[in-house]
């Protein structure tokens, strides 16, 4: 059985503001690995959470 991808939101912070970037992953662990790529590029990731649909 294939596991579908979930939309996660990464919260990143800069010097004066924070913003959210969507990533698609099969698990929180996979989303964390994607967040590490942003950190390697110089961004500060402060939160990873699944998208909550209203």
UniProtKB/Swiss-Prot annotation:
UniProt record, GO biological process: symbiont-mediated suppression of host gene expression
UniProt-listed Pfam families: RNA_pol_inhib
InterPro entries xrefs: RNA_pol_inhibitor, RNA_pol_inhibitor_sf
Record lineage: Viruses, Duplodnaviria, Heunggongvirae, Uroviricota, Caudoviricetes
Gene3D superfamilies: RNA polymerase inhibitor
Keyword Kinase: no
Annotated keywords: Bacterial host gene expression shutoff by virus, Bacterial host transcription shutoff by virus, Host gene expression shutoff by virus, Host-virus interaction
Species this chain originates from: Enterobacteria phage T3 (Bacteriophage T3)
Superkingdom per UniProt: Viruses
Protein name: Bacterial RNA polymerase inhibitor
Function: Acts as an inhibitor of bacterial RNA polymerase.
Gene behind this protein: 2
Coiled-coil stretches: none
